[in-house]
């Protein structure tokens, strides 16, 4: 499971010109699943994302978590995080989980996160337009296989 975590002051996702999810201060997550990912990866990622101290405190130090600031999450499925660019000029996506499996894990992931904080989301497999204002910028890549 690979996740690009971006600290944002606002973010939204639109499908066919209609905004289907929007947040203010919080995290934009681009989430991809590999064929060996499972519930253990989901649990690990949820724990890390909700407890990671990447928001500034009163002294401008990154000491606060998403939960501390009562922030929100915008979750976007992103199979392209598993792109293989070793050969040629066109990325291969054979290292990504099959859509049926990835869709199920994405649902589990979002459901688990929503128990901790407000969550908005894109639509799995849809062509989406994501807008964000990156705060910092702070962008972190989490790979659940690198623990």
UniProtKB/Swiss-Prot annotation:
GO terms for biological process: D-amino acid catabolic process. A motif (Gly-cisPro motif, important for rejection of L-amino acids) lies at residues 136-137. GO terms for molecular function: D-tyrosyl-tRNA(Tyr) deacylase activity; Gly-tRNA(Ala) deacylase activity; Ser(Gly)-tRNA(Ala) hydrolase activity; tRNA binding. GO terms for cellular component: cytoplasm. It holds the Pfam family Tyr_Deacylase. Keywords: Cytoplasm, Hydrolase, RNA-binding, tRNA-binding. It is found in: Cytoplasm. Its EC number is 3.1.1.96. It is an enzyme of class 3 (hydrolase). SUPFAM superfamilies: DTD-like (SSF69500). NCBIfam families: D-aminoacyl-tRNA deacylase. Belongs to the DTD family. An aminoacyl-tRNA editing enzyme that deacylates mischarged D-aminoacyl-tRNAs. Also deacylates mischarged glycyl-tRNA(Ala), protecting cells against glycine mischarging by AlaRS. Acts via tRNA-based rather than protein-based catalysis; rejects L-amino acids rather than detecting D-amino acids in the active site. By recycling D-aminoacyl-tRNA to D-amino acids and free tRNA molecules, this enzyme counteracts the toxicity associated with the formation of D-aminoacyl-tRNA entities in vivo and helps enforce protein L-homochirality. A Gly-cisPro motif from one monomer fits into the active site of the other monomer to allow specific chiral rejection of L-amino acids. Homodimer. This is D-aminoacyl-tRNA deacylase. It comes from Streptococcus uberis (strain ATCC BAA-854 / 0140J).
